[in-house]
């Protein structure tokens, strides 16, 4: 956790966000190991959701797996699904959404080490972002990305004209 705080330059909001996520992730992992752990873990997880979603406006689900030195810049409107796996040195900015493509497909992205996401990036589906990938602001990523790549642009295209 100390590495996370250093990676966030000791800035109050990002440090609080990462620290809260780390505690919630610990609770999420340990409550599955023994049913008695729910006595202390479940109330903390409920409190985590209330504080993060209602008061701070972001949703990094406790079951998401994020590696060391997780950095957040301007962490407003961030949504990370519980099935997301991200490596070390993962950096995000405001408006980032990482998750599945819908109720019929619950698979989520696997994100490598050293990945940096710009503002308002959307990453959806069963894809892999390689190591040392940078995704530019406003990009929509629906396909896997190889290592050491720079990804920019939107994926939207017209299907039907009304």
Curated annotation (Swiss-Prot):
The keyword Transferase applies. Pathway: Slime biogenesis; slime polysaccharide biosynthesis. Its EC number is 2.3.1.-. Keywords: Acyltransferase, Lipopolysaccharide biosynthesis, Repeat, Transferase. Pfam families: Hexapep. InterPro entries: Colanic_acid_synth_WcaB, Hexapep, Hexapep_transf_CS, LbH_SAT, Ser_O-AcTrfase, Trimer_LpxA-like_sf. It is an enzyme of class 2 (transferase). One of its GO terms (biological process) is slime layer polysaccharide biosynthetic process. NCBIfam families: PRK10191.1, WcaB. This is Putative colanic acid biosynthesis acetyltransferase WcaB. It comes from Escherichia coli (strain K12). The gene is wcaB.
